[in-house]
């Protein structure tokens, strides 16, 4: 967590704080008419030219053909088939494309794309007889496939067979990203999240063209990655988490599994080992890393700024070199993140010494450095990337680094932090950087946000999710969605397309997709959520839930087309927004 002072984050307190609170979340409400598919794509494409009256029917005989002889293109085709088969029930065989695109096919080709799409963009042309996605790389094909998914009804994301028909509107789309780097961060140190949860998050990122996953692997509360040369980091340092749970860690095989799974979704994993602060789990594991030679106790609170590696000891840099070497060997991507934030227990002089010693250790692994923008207090090489997490719109260190050739990742805490609450009644999350509603998450320009950091100096945008209060996949969903989609659009779409009114319409059209995927998203009152023809709220026989009403154990209400039973006394806690920690039991659709 990036915060100037310590904060408590017990789950029980988060739940109790709901008592007497009101909610600003909205119900799923039917749009006046279903949003046309070409007006519901997130991120919005750079250019869309509709073909009036034309649709491509996806039917049982439809096939997927891919660039002949290209394994990466075939992998994208296999991925697309895997998305569409469960809901449609169609076979959708994948094979090499012949010389000309056959009728009744979806073609994924690595030839014929306009030069303007670059290495990550694509061209998509849908006609009455075929859909053709062209790109220069498999990354571009994969991006085009994500757009293709959103041209189909949201129920296509269901894991079970759904009724058709399935049609794709006729159009020509030419699309490419504003920034090459579009990322999200998951903190697996404060609360450990198993491989299955990380993979689920990867799938959620991929559909919005996010191409980098930053994993926060070590902090005061736990060390989460196996390091053979320092085994107690995980066997001891990985045994705790916030609140005193059992913690956990990834073996090298599990981490490799995550990296490979992300790569199959065209996402690069960026591992972070935060230092010289946020290191209590390491200090507790090895006494020799402490200046006084005494290992502190493991900690499960959420205080920050109290721990530091011993800057003057040679063994500190042996330790760091070993960790970086083993981590780099597991990580095919170009970056390693060294943290560098909130090092309050490290003197200013020692901090500069530390950064200057660690930079060449990273370079020795063949990787480039990313660090929280605090590292820009040192003189950085042009290859280093400071990640801005502050709440201001200027930073002298960052602007100096840019003047020397560095590019910046933007994650301003009051705009991009997914762990910030939406409002005062949000049941989980923090608020030190302020509340971030959907419009706040969308309403800033990364290319003109930081003084001295113009568009060309921005590597991209990243959405960090710190996990002091985040325990379950449902918690991840609730804080990430819908804000992650807003950040994805900021990173992908040209600024000329930026329009809140249009975006909130397209965002509302995502609801049927998220419902089909089982994503527990926050139903912001700022957005008119389209139910896509599913059961509407208010059709249940039981009384509709009210934020102002007091409920006690056994009370039954209806909300969002489901029937809910209260477990205990409550007022203001919206059914379906707090997962396993909530007061309401979901009895299913009415």
Where are these regions (language model features)?
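Flexible, acidic glycine-rich loops studded with aromatic residues
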Residues: 89, 381, 390-537
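Feature activates predominantly on carbohydrate-active enzymes
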Residues: 117-306, 315-317, 325-328, 332-335
């Amino acid at each position: 967590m990036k915060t100037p002072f310590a904060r408590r984050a017990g789950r029980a307190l988060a739940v109790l704080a709901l008592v007497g609170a009101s909610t600003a979340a909205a119900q799923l409400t039917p749009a006046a008419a279903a949003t046309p598919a070409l007006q519901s794509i997130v991120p919005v494409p750079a250019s869309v030219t509709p073909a009036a009256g034309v649709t491509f029917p996806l039917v049982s005989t439809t096939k997927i053909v891919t660039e002949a002889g290209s394994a990466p293109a075939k992998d994208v085709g296999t991925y697309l088939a895997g998305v569409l088969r469960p809901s449609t029930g169609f076979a959708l065989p994948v094979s090499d494309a012949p010389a000309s695109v056959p009728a009744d096919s979806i073609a994924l080709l690595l030839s014929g794309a306009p030069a303007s799409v670059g290495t990550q963009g694509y061209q998509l042309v849908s006609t009455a007889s075929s859909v053709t996605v062209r790109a220069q790389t498999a990354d571009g094909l994969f991006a085009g496939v994500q757009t293709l998914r959103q041209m189909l009804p949201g129920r296509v994301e269901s894991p079970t067979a759904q009724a058709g028909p399935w049609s794709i509107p006729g159009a020509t789309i030419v699309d490419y990203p504003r920034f090459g780097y579009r990322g999200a961060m998951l903190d697996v140190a404060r609360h450990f999240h198993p491989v299955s949860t990380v993979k689920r998050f990867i799938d959620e990122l991929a559909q919005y063209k996010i191409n980098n996953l930053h994993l926060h692997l070590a902090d005061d509360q736990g060390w989460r990655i196996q390091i053979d040369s320092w085994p107690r980091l995980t066997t001891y340092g990985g045994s705790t988490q916030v609140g005193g749970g059992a913690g956990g860690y990834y073996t090298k095989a599990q981490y490799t599994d995550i990296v490979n799974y992300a790569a199959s979704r065209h996402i690069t994993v960026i591992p972070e080992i935060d230092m010289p602060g946020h290191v209590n789990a390491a200090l507790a594991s090895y006494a020799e890393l402490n200046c006084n030679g005494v290992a502190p106790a493991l900690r499960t609170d959420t205080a920050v700024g109290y721990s530091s590696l011993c800057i003057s000891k040679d063994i500190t840099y042996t330790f760091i070199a070993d960790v970086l070497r083993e981590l780099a060997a597991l990580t095919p991507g170009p970056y390693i993140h060294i943290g560098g934030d909130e090092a309050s227990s490290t003197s200013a002089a020692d901090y500069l010494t530390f950064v200057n010693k660690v930079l060449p250790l990273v370079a020795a692994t063949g990787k480039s450095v990313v660090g929280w923008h605090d590292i820009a207090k040192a003189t950085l090489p042009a290859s280093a990337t400071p990640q801005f997490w502050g709440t201001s719109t200027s930073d002298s260190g960052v602007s100096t680094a840019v003047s020397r050739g560095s590019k910046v990742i933007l994650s301003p805490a009051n705009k991009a932090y997914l762990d910030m609450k939406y409002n005062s009644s949000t049941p989980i999350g923090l608020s030190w950087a302020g509340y971030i509603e959907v419009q706040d998450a969308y309403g800033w320009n990364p290319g003109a946000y930081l003084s001295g950091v113009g568009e060309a100096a921005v590597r991209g945008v990243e959405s960090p999710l710190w996990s002091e209060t985040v325990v379950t996949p449902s918690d991840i969903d609730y804080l990430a969605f819908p804000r992650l989609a807003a950040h994805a659009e900021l990173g992908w779409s040209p600024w000329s397309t930026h329009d809140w009114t249009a975006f909130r319409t397209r965002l509302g059209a995502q609801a049927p997709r998220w419902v089909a995927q089982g994503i527990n998203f926050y139903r912001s009152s700022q957005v008119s959520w389209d139910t896509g023809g599913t059961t509407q709220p208010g059709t249940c026989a039981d009384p509709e839930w009210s934020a102002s009403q007091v409920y006690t154990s056994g009370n039954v209400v209806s909300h969002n087309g489901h029937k809910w039973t209260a477990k205990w006394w409550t007022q203001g806690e919206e059914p379906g927004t707090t997962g396993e920690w909530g007061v309401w039991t979901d009895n299913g659709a009415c």
